[in-house]
Amino acid sequence: MKVAVIGSGGREHTLAWSLVRSPEVSHCYCLPGNGGTAGLPKTENVAIAVDQLGEICEFCQTEKINLVVVGPELPLTLGLTDQLQALGIKVFGPTKAGAELEASKSWTKQLLIEAGVPTAFGETFTEPAPAQAYATKMGAPIVVKADGLAAGKGVIVAQTSAEATTAIAELFDQGFEKIVVEEFLPGEEVSVLALCDGKTVIPLLPAQDHKRIGEGDQGLNTGGMGAYCPAPIAPPAVIDQVQKQILQPTANALAKRGIDYRGVLYAGLMVSPTGEIKVLEYNCRFGDPETQAVLPLLATPLEKVLMACVEQNLEQLGPLQWHSGNAVCVVVAAGGYPGSYRKGDEINGLAEAEAQDVKVFHAGTELKEGKVLTNGGRVLGVTALGKDLSTAIATAYRGVEQIDFDGMYYRRDIGHKAL
């Protein structure tokens, strides 16, 4: 079968890498792909951007693509799935209506309340003054969220009322029409990515992401500086609870609204010190860098799983098979990220890193005249497997140490809180 992966990040390199390992997949096109997908067997980069919906549809029709896998949220919220489906092309990823789950925090909050899914208490506002008054009344710490896509950076945990007031003003100044102000939930975060075919929901192994740029979870929020899987905070009994109380009720609520949701339900959850689980947010696609830690542990062929979602027969698939052990992904970023950063620096040591028994997934890279150059804030994700978490961590960092480019930065504490 011929597949197309839409996107250019570490998540998309991981998806393409997982897909082409199967003998069932004859060819994989990455639109537009990156420096890593350029070197994968059976894989070809195609210079079409993720928001060029017409060109994507035309390409998939011409090439007779059997399955399109959409990586990022943007094309989903623009309605790429709807357009491909109208042409009779099979696509993994929700329709525009389903992508509201990530595109609108207020819409999702309403859906969760209606479905009786536990989530943080909060209110939605369309003007700064009432939002600021509400935040002051609630007291700090308090959470301020942009109602719209903000590339994973639209959530501010304000430690003081003054900080909340500033954050609210800034989000409205940035052009967001609505914001959500909600209670701060203490505890430990976990990401549960689940597959949904519109009826059945199957959770993947739980992962934990590291959002802050600095060690010890200090500094600015990023798209994610590393992840490990499975996360011990969510053992199988907890995942069963998540399935029954959160994932399945969400899928049912979507179906009740007439939304045929076939794709990833990514639940960002908070596990309180007493073991209570609440939804912080939903995303409508694979997480990045969680995907780089979760998919290498999946033993069931990925294309089989995704096709079962698209063809609405997840129930017939049976339980997913997993490799034993743990996976860790350490993200290597460009100096200055998440602020302004340089591009175009040559990356050395990639082959030496992979000789350390790691897999290097490319994110912000491009291949130019045979050289791999930096081309984004998060540049690489170095993934290692191990019989236990400490082995996987040690192997991942051995790999990272082989890599070198100007201004390279990475956190040295990925996975440590689970040791």
From Swiss-Prot:
GO terms for biological process: 'de novo' IMP biosynthetic process; purine nucleobase biosynthetic process. Its EC number is 6.3.4.13. Pathway: Purine metabolism; IMP biosynthesis via de novo pathway; N(1)-(5-phospho-D-ribosyl)glycinamide from 5-phospho-alpha-D-ribose 1-diphosphate: step 2/2. One of its GO terms (molecular function) is phosphoribosylamine-glycine ligase activity. Signal peptide: none annotated. Belongs to the GARS family. NCBIfam families: purD. Its cofactor is Mg(2+); Mn(2+). Mg(2+) binds at residues 281, 283. It catalyses: 5-phospho-beta-D-ribosylamine + glycine + ATP = N(1)-(5-phospho-beta-D-ribosyl)glycinamide + ADP + phosphate + H(+). ATP binds at residues 135-191. It comes from Synechocystis sp. (strain ATCC 27184 / PCC 6803 / Kazusa). Residues 109-311 form the ATP-grasp domain. Binds 1 Mg(2+) or Mn(2+) ion per subunit. PROSITE patterns: ATP_GRASP, GARS. It is an enzyme of class 6 (ligase). It holds the Pfam family GARS_C. Keywords: ATP-binding, Ligase, Magnesium, Manganese, Metal-binding, Nucleotide-binding, Purine biosynthesis. This is Phosphoribosylamine--glycine ligase. SUPFAM superfamilies: Glutathione synthetase ATP-binding domain-like, PreATP-grasp domain, Rudiment single hybrid motif.
